[in-house]
Structures are given as C-alpha cells and as structure tokens.
Amino acid sequence: MKLPIYLDYAATTPVDPRVAEKMFQYMTMDGIFGNPASRSHRYGWQAEEAVDVARNQVADLINADHREIVFTSGATESNNLAIKGVAHFYKKKGKHIITSKTEHKAVLDTCRQLEREGFEVTYLEPESNGIIPMARLEAAMRDDTILVSIMHVNNEIGVIHDIDAIGELCRSKGIIFHMDAAQSAGKLPIDVQATKVDLISISGHKMYGPKGIGALYVRRKPRIRLEAQMHGGGHERGMRSGTLPTHQIVGLGEASAIAKAEMATDNVRIAKLRDKLWNGIKHIEETYVNGDMNQRTSGSLNVSFNYVEGESLMMALKDLAVSSGSACTSASLEPSYVLRALGLNDEMAHSSIRFSIGRFTTEEEIDHAIEVITQSIDKLREMSPLWEMFKDGIDLNQVQWAHH
C-alpha cells in the first residue's frame, strides 16, 4: 500500500495507464505528431483523423453528435466560453442570468465579470441538503433571462441536481441551460437526446484523462450560438481558435471511451468503498455528512467532525491525501462558501473534510483510512478544551467569550 493514500479524486484523477499509453503515440517523430490543421500532407491528415476519432468518443459519452463537441483547455475555459459566449451573443434579448451560490468559482467568477459588464445575475440559495429547489429556480426566471447555469454534481459535497427537470423548465421558458459537468462526465450517464441541456462543460483530468484538456458540448438543434472568447485561426468552427493538442485530445477521447465502458461497474465498486468508509467512521460522536445522502455521486463523502479544526485534522491525517473544500479554494482560510450556503456555521464548515474515492482506491486503503481517522479525531479532541466543555454539557452557543 502506497502512502499517503490518495482520497482526493474530486480534485484530480491520475491518468489511466491505458490513456497514457495511447497518448505517447502522438508526440514524437515516430508517432503521429502533425498539426491537425495541416491539410497538405500525411502528418496533418493522420493527426486530424486521430482528433476526429477522439471527438466521436467524447460525443458518444454523452450521446451527442460529433459536430457538437468543441475542444477547450478544460472545464474552466468551457464555463467561460459557455457563459460569456451566450451573454455576449444574446445580450439584445436580455441581460439576466441565473446560477447558484454553490457553483464552482469558474462559474461564479465568470458571472461576476459579466455583472461588471452590466449583466444582472441571480445567485440561488440551495436547501440544507445542497440541492436547488425547482420552485426557487422557476420563481427567479424573468422575461429577460437568457441563461441558467447549474452544475450537474457539486465538487465539494457531491450532490446531484435533477438536470432533466431543470432542462424541461428552461426549454419551456425559452432559456438556454448550461451545465458544468466537470464532476459528472464519465461518472454519471448523460444523454443529451433525453435531457434538454444546451451547453455542457467537460474536464479531462476529472475522469482519468490528462490535465489541460476539456470540451464544451454546444447543442445544434435547437441551435445555440456563442461569441468566441479566443480569436485566431478559426479552429473548432470559429468557437475556439488555437492549434489542437492532438495527444491531449486523444487522451480525452480514450478516457471517455473507457469511462463509458466501465462506468456502471466502477460506480458499484466505488459506492461500496464509500459506504464502507462512512460505516467505519459514523460511530464517531458529533460526525455529520454534508449534502444529501441519497442524491449524491458514488465517490463523494464530505464530513464535518464537530469540535475538530479541519486544518489540524488534515495535518493529523498525513497518511491520507484529502482536502477541506475544493482544491481551487483550499489555499484560503475562509470556511467553504459551499458549506456556508448549506447553512452550516463557521465552526462546522471549518471542521469538514472532503473524501473522494476513485477507480484505483482499494479496500485495504479504506480500512487504513478508517483507522487513521478514528485515532486522529480521538487525539485531537483529547487536546480540545471545547470538546471537554461539550462533554460536560455546556452549551457552547450560550458561552460569552471574553475579548482580550
């Protein structure tokens, strides 16, 4: 067993060895290294063919047409292109956008930028289980609403939104629906023929593909128009200029094909490990799961250990690679904005740890994790005066702390 044990699959996944092996064939002089846009010789044609195959593999993952897939540098760029692209193209129709308070920063900060440009954004509050109620979404819709951007799966707590219902509602009102699927593509079935979603952001490195590559699904029927954010040679049907990185695209394609083939078996195994982990630690006093327990992805478990500081717990869990909050905001000392939006107080939000399990997690690793977590919590609580006061029956919310 390799230490530390990697339990941070929601931050990134290792590249599947089968994907890495395939990528190696598209980089060196011995391989297919040409520019896919070079139309005058075999090096370019072979690269273009490899890109076409990968485009089909990504499209197959979500049951789309290959012409609806635009390659980007990742989900952050896809979110930017989708949200800014729609806002700028349809601004004469309206300037109102709806999103939620628990979105990834790549969506929230893009919306903030649009606010600076004169757009109006409504940030919906979730229920305490992390899910946005449909009635709240419908109530926020106006005649000038042009876009709804709601994530499929939350990156911190793993809850799943009902995208079919959101899609139906948006389509009935003539509003474009964008979905950030960084955490769900390759892990949950997505079918764009059945779900009325217009734009989907996909990330390679969240599904055992390489970092630095992603895709944006752009619906053709009804046709969604975007204003390009990256200008140049007019690649990707004018939506995203820049030489296509063949080896990364091949990696994303291969990762998509593997995910499609193995999703069902992967999910059963991962859910078993997740339940094993929770069953192994839920007996610890004052331990709570954040987010809906049923409507969540198989690999995700966000737990608050009351009266334990999240940062000190992470230090104590040095054998486990876990995070408090998302990797993108883990450098800040602020409590998770996602958990605060669920109604958790600062203390509970600060004492949360995100465990995310994936394709290469083993049972032995989970057993070790349970042991380490149990010991660490005991040790930290032994040192905590707050825990002692709580055990003595003192209501800490009523305590008047002296200010020095």
From Swiss-Prot:
Catalytic activity of the protein: (sulfur carrier)-H + L-cysteine = (sulfur carrier)-SH + L-alanine
Chain residues that bind pyridoxal 5'-phosphate: 75-76, 155, 183, 203-205, 243
Sites where the protein binds [2Fe-2S] cluster: 328
Gene3D superfamilies (UniProt xref): Aspartate Aminotransferase, domain 1 (3.90.1150.10), Type I PLP-dependent aspartate aminotransferase-like (Major domain) (3.40.640.10)
Enzyme class, UniProt record, top EC level: transferase
List of residues that carry N6-(pyridoxal phosphate)lysine: 206
Residues forming the catalytic site: 328
A Pfam family annotated for this UniProt entry: Aminotran_5
Cofactor: pyridoxal 5'-phosphate
Subcellular location: Cytoplasm
Gene Ontology terms, MF aspect: 2 iron, 2 sulfur cluster binding; cysteine desulfurase activity; metal ion binding; pyridoxal phosphate binding
Protein's recorded name: Cysteine desulfurase IscS
Species in which this protein is naturally found: Shewanella oneidensis (strain ATCC 700550 / JCM 31522 / CIP 106686 / LMG 19005 / NCIMB 14063 / MR-1)
